Amino acid sequence: MFLTERNTTSEATFTLLGFSDYLELQIPLFFVFLAVYGFSVVGNLGMIVIIKINPKLHTPMYFFLNHLSFVDFCYSSIIAPMMLVNLVVEDRTISFSGCLVQFFFFCTFVVTELILFAVMAYDHFVAICNPLLYTVAISQKLCAMLVVVLYAWGVACSLTLACSALKLSFHGFNTINHFFCELSSLISLSYPDSYLSQLLLFTVATFNEISTLLIILTSYAFIIVTTLKMPSASGHRKVFSTCASHLTAITIFHGTILFLYCVPNSKNSRHTVKVASVFYTVVIPLLNPLIYSLRNKDVKDAIRKIINTKYFHIKHRHWYPFNFVIEQ
């Protein structure tokens, strides 16, 4: 009987409803999401390139920011392309294995980003509270180890939840009232009692949220105490410029995750869940590079330096109707 249930599950087919309730908005939404995703890709890959080519940004803080841009690019690229396709085609079906693969990679990168924000908070804490020991405390070896650990933890959490999803059983054809394969949506469709799977999802999400927020809040509590002891206003401004971008990104990302996964589903309508999911799967990956570029002096200086090089500056080239020559 177990084999029969496993075969039924593996052969199950799902239809992603997405935004089919709003047929008149399908095309406008397609172009809006395409633009947002396009700018997100350019912003995150651009941030990676800027950090790579500018030696001044080869510090632990920008090493972690580099990985944040990579993670944002990855998890938005797992969701956005399929969402865009489903906005313009009638066949929105996906197999159970396809659903599971999408969820696994998406969950891996989302959990990785949660831990990464906590690591970045600790990095800010050491830089501000122990500046003389910063290069010793946050060494290249430690940075590499932390990155390996946070990716490994993301994979471990995803693997645990994916294995729990393998135990779910479905009847043939199913409809997911979402635009991607979210585990809570799959659990709600399974026909035996799926309480344990729901409990596991809630436990993993809550544990990651509480542990990372505890690290973040503790780090910033020490940062605030240290800042209040600084006699000069310039020191306060420097701390603010260092932490403002990170705090803004944390507030947006963690607020959305808490709303979606650490509140009982019954308290949120499916429409509200979809809107919040769009925000953290498509919009947040666009906002992060903007936040870190517009509110970060070092990044703005790096961008300005690139623009002002002889290859980009208008004063260093003469334009002709069919060609241009760059002055040496």
UniProtKB/Swiss-Prot annotation:
Residues 1-27, 78-101, 163-198, 261-273 are extracellular. Pfam families: 7tm_4. Its main location: membrane. GO terms for molecular function: G protein-coupled receptor activity; odorant binding; olfactory receptor activity. It is found in: Cell membrane. It is a multi-pass membrane protein. GO terms for cellular component: plasma membrane. The chain crosses the membrane at residues 28-48, 57-77, 102-122, 142-162, 199-219, 240-260, 274-294. SUPFAM superfamilies: Family A G protein-coupled receptor-like. Residues 49-56, 123-141, 220-239, 295-328 are cytoplasmic. Glycans are attached at N7. Keywords: Cell membrane, G-protein coupled receptor, Glycoprotein, Membrane, Olfaction, Receptor, Sensory transduction, Transducer, Transmembrane, Transmembrane helix. One of its GO terms (biological process) is sensory perception of smell. Belongs to the G-protein coupled receptor 1 family. Odorant receptor. This is Olfactory receptor 5D16. It comes from Homo sapiens.
